[in-house]
Every structure is written in structure tokens, then in C-alpha cells.
Curated annotation (Swiss-Prot):
The gene is MT-CYB. This is Cytochrome b. Its cofactor is heme b. The keyword Chloroplast does not apply. It comes from Lonchophylla mordax (Godman's nectar bat). The chain crosses the membrane at residues 33-53, 77-98, 113-133, 178-198, 226-246, 288-308, 320-340, 347-367. It holds the Pfam family Cytochrom_B_C. Heme b b562 binds at residues 83, 182. The cytochrome bc1 complex contains 11 subunits: 3 respiratory subunits (MT-CYB, CYC1 and UQCRFS1), 2 core proteins (UQCRC1 and UQCRC2) and 6 low-molecular weight proteins (UQCRH/QCR6, UQCRB/QCR7, UQCRQ/QCR8, UQCR10/QCR9, UQCR11/QCR10 and a cleavage product of UQCRFS1). This cytochrome bc1 complex then forms a dimer.
Length: 379
């Protein structure tokens, strides 16, 4: 008798995706982040769903409703901090996942890569809107500053901003629509994840060597299921430690002050996971130029397949490219630090240098070094 998991129309899909899926035998721990992102998304949707049951999207009561969740709802504090710190874990996993793709040349699967970029943008938009919901000082001013950037778009900018705000400033209408979209977007993300996996399973996974692994495949279950479960346990250990011991470590104290349009905080800054992009935005002393640089800092990932000049796919056997890659990581960490600093000397000049270096490494140095490595190997 044939196993039901191989014949049932629904189970068959799951079987071909998670059980009998042929996977390369050499996948390292860097391939764990895809499944970790799935866990993060599930956790965010579940905690978010329960938070939404008690939250009120109204400027008069939003801040108090979050306080009510933390004080009066059974384990409300746990839900709230799991959701807030879960977002941080989500972005840590996202950036490591993208970094893995860059290092091992996974971007040559262009459809999977492009859907991944779309996912990144959607998750970033979702996180930004979520940060506005508690209606603290940083929520309000962050929303004001970031949405106001759209006014840099020529001709339609001002009308566009007022259309998004639903008025002449960030107010009740803005909060209501941000809550609506913050609730909706994770489900769009879940749908895009399906498309991402669909394209990935068309080609099969890449592996650390970058060499085709068709002759050497193993079933996903039990080998990678057990490996993924170990990853889940490690991530959930870190998350629960963060939530239970220092839940406000990654947050901003200003967000514990209710939103006040008449009082601007001394340093307006986004959550830590957007600081690198914020630093790039601030490093250009022109509004439109800054906005373009901000968008391009992520959109630059889309040209990676075109800029791949090496005859080898992975960086595993390319020490010069590896040096550039880790320099890029250092530059991104520098930008993250600069994004949280005030706009004054020497931070401004460091931010500008790091921003130039960021684009230079990806657009110019990496392709040049790849060509050089080809020549060194007489390819």
C-alpha cells in the first residue's frame, strides 16, 4: 500500500516540501535561517493576533491600551515583549539569511532572490508600521519623519504624504490605517514565503561549495528537520532570555512617554534594525538624494546577480572576495552605530565615508576583485 503522505493531494505537497525533499548533504548552519524566519513569522502572527484583541487603534487610548495589556491582561506583558523582541530576532535572522545568500552566491537563483527582496521590503514596512502603534514619542515622531520623506518625490510628494496621513499631520486616521496594514501585511508575507519556496524548490538548494550537488542528495527528513529543531531551540533560548531578563534592552526609553506633537524628542531614531539605512539617509545633505540612497541601500541587492563576475558561485574558495565581504559587514555595523548617534562631528563624516564604502564595495570592488580572482586562477 502506498503511503498516504505520498498520495493525499494536500499531504503530498507538504511531503515534497519537508519530508522527501532532496537536499544537498553539505548544508551548514547558515542554511538554518530560512526555517528560523518561518518560526519568527509564525510567532509574530500568533502574538500579534492576541495583542490585537486588546489593542485600540485610537490616538486617545492606544498608549493606555498597551499599558493595559502589560498590566491587566493574563501574560499580556509576555505577549507584548515576545512580539517586540521577536521582531528583533526576525531581523537578525533576515540579515544573516541575506548575508548567507551574498556569501554563497545564492542570488544566482534570480526568481527566489527577487521574491526574497520583495519579502525584505514588506517585512521592513510591517515593522515600521508596528513601531507606530504603541503611540509613544518615538512612534509618533518616527512616523512623522519617515512618512514625510515621501514629500521629496517631485510634483506629487506633498499630496502623497497628506494622502498617507489622512490629513495634514500624523493623527487618528494615520494610526488606524497603520494598524490595518500592520495586521494585513504578515499574511501577505506568508503568501510571498510560499512563492519564495516554490521558486526555491524549482531549482533545489544551493550549498556551501557552490558546486551542483545533484549526485549527492539526502532526504530533508530526518536530517535537516532535526537540524532545524536544534536551530529553533537555540533561537528561542536567546529570545526567551531577552524577553525575561531585559525586555527593553533594544527599545527606546522615549517610547514610554505618550506621543506629544508639541514636544520633539532630542534624537529621533528608528529601531536598531533600521539604523544602517537611516545613517545612509542622513549622510546625504539633500532630501531627495537621501531618500534615493535609502531605497537603493536595499534595492542594490537586485543587481547582485548581474554584478556576479566570478567563474565560481560561492565565496568559499575566494579569499579576496571574502575579505571584501567581511569589510562590508564591518561597514554595515559602523552604519548601524552611526545611525544611533546625533548629527554632529565626527559622526556625520564617518557616516558619509561608510555610506560611500557600502555602495563602492557592492557595485565596484566586488566585481573587480572577482575578475582579478578569475585571472589569478587563469580562468
Amino acid at each position: 500500500m502506498t503511503n498516504i503522505r505520498k498520495t493525499h493531494p494536500l499531504l503530498k505537497i507538504l511531503n515534497n516540501s519537508f519530508v522527501d525533499l532532496p537536499a544537498p548533504s553539505s548544508l551548514s548552519a547558515w542554511w538554518n535561517f530560512g526555517s528560523l524566519l518561518g518560526v519568527c513569522l509564525t510567532l509574530q502572527i500568533l502574538t500579534g493576533l492576541f495583542l490585537a484583541m486588546h489593542y485600540t487603534a485610537d490616538t486617545a487610548t492606544a498608549f493606555n491600551s498597551v499599558a493595559h495589556i502589560c498590566r491587566d491582561v493574563n501574560y499580556g506583558w509576555l505577549l507584548r515583549y515576545l512580539h517586540a523582541n521577536g521582531a528583533s530576532m526576525f531581523f537578525i535572522c533576515l540579515y544573516l539569511h541575506v548575508g548567507r545568500g551574498l556569501y554563497y552566491g545564492s542570488y544566482t537563483y534570480t526568481e527566489t532572490w527577487n521574491v526574497g527582496i520583495l519579502l525584505l521590503f514588506t517585512v521592513m514596512a510591517t515593522a515600521f508600521m508596528g513601531y507606530v502603534l504603541p503611540w509613544g514619542q518615538m512612534s509618533f515622531w518616527g512616523a512623522t519623519v519617515i512618512t514625510n520623506l515621501l514629500s521629496a518625490i517631485p510634483y506629487i510628494g506633498t499630496e502623497l504624504v497628506q494622502w498617507i496621513w489622512g490629513g495634514f499631520s500624523v493623527d487618528k486616521a494615520t494610526l488606524t490605517r497603520f494598524f490595518t496594514f500592520h495586521f494585513l501585511f504578515p499574511f501577505i508575507v506568508a503568501a510571498l514565503v510560499m512563492v519564495h519556496l516554490l521558486f526555491l524548490h524549482e531549482t533545489g538548494s544551493n550549498n556551501p561549495t557552490g558546486i551542483p550537488s545533484d549526485p549527492d542528495m539526502i532526504p530533508f527528513h530526518p536530517y535537516y528537520t532535526i537540524k532545524d529543531i536544534l536551530g529553533f531551540l537555540m533561537m528561542l533560548t536567546v529570545l526567551s532570555t531577552l524577553v525575561l531578563f531585559s525586555p527593553d534592552l533594544l527599545g527606546d526609553p522615549d517610547n514610554y512617554t505618550p506621543a506629544n506633537p508639541l514636544n520633539t524628542p532630542p534624537h529621533i531614531k528608528p529601531e536598531w534594525y533600521f539604523l544602517f539605512a537611516y545613517a545612509i539617509l542622513r549622510s546625504i545633505p539633500n532630501k531627495l538624494g537621501g531618500v534615493l540612497a535609502l531605497v537603493l541601500s536595499i534595492l542594490i541587492l537586485a543587481v547582485m546577480p548581474v554584478l556576479h563576475m566570478s567563474k565560481q558561485r560561492s565565496m568559499m574558495f575566494r579569499p579576496l572576495s571574502q575579505c571584501l565581504f567581511w569589510l562590508l559587514v564591518a561597514v554595515l555595523l559602523t552604519l548601524t552605530w552611526i545611525g544611533g548617534q546625533p548629527v554632529e562631528y565626527p559622526y556625520v563624516i564617518i557616516g558619509q565615508a561608510a555610506s560611500v564604502l557600502y555602495f563602492m564595495i557592492l557595485l565596484i570592488l566586488m566585481p573587480l576583485v572577482s575578475i582579478m580572482e578569475n585571472k589569478l586562477l587563469k580562468w
